[in-house]
Regions:
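Acidic, small-residue rich beta-repeat scaffolds with periodic aromatic anchors
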Residues: 4-6, 20-36, 114-156
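Bacterial N-terminal signal peptides
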Residues: 8-17
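Terminal domain-start segments
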Residues: 19-63, 156
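Beta-propeller blade repeat segments, especially FG-GAP/WD-type strand-to-loop junctions
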Residues: 22-32, 41-43, 85-105, 136-145
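Beta-propeller blade termini
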Residues: 56-67, 109-124
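Repetitive beta-architecture junctions, highlighting loop-to-beta-strand starts
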Residues: 58, 88-90, 132
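Acidic/hydrophobic-patterned starts of short beta strands in beta-sheet-rich repeat architectures
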Residues: 66-78, 92, 119-129
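Short glycine/acidic-enriched loop and turn motifs that connect beta-strands
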Residues: 79-82, 132
Length: 156
């Protein structure tokens, strides 16, 4: 199993520890990607407010998800006080042609990339959390929006 890249919010110097993902994304690009997701080297509101378990901001995946030749990254953070019963949230960021990073999607829950695709080759994302009827997000050329729901108890 691939090691995870953990972003230490306590360190003002944007300390990043990694075993394998660091090889996939240069340090400066990691910092830009975290910044696009809203994590800029200070403690997040989730980290400050959390009284129970807190999972630090982590870069879970670095991969070209839409086939444009540029890397994309999935960033997660765990906190029941910020993300409710799901206990986790995700941020999908993408490197743009100008070298900047853009937030493509963020939700409470876990992201599961599906084989189906929206515009520009972006994979649909099933947002998994508590329950058994989950939204599926599809990229429409501007942003990810709820496209449909999947699960045992969905009545569509």
């Amino acid at each position: 199993m691939r090691a995870r890249l953990t972003f230490s919010l306590w360190a003002a110097s944007l300390a990043i520890s990694s075993l394998s993902i660091a090889d996939e994304l240069a340090r400066q690009e990691q910092i830009k990607a975290f910044g696009a997701a809203g994590f800029n080297g200070t403690s997040s509101a989730c980290e400050i407010e959390e009284t129970g378990n807190y999972t630090p901001v982590t870069m879970e995946l670095v991969k070209d998800l839409n086939g444009d030749g540029r890397q994309d990254a999935l960033i997660t953070e765990g906190s029941a006080s910020c993300y409710g019963l799901a206990g986790t949230g995700f941020y999908l960021v993408s490197r743009q042609p100008d070298g900047q990073w853009k937030l493509m999607a963020s939700e409470s829950g876990s992201a599961e990339f599906l084989a189906s695709k929206g515009r520009d080759g972006w994979p649909d994302i099933q947002v998994v959390g508590p329950g058994s009827c989950f939204p599926v997000l599809r990229y429409d050329g501007e942003r990810y929006r709820v496209h449909h729901r999947m699960g045992d108890t969905c009545h569509e």
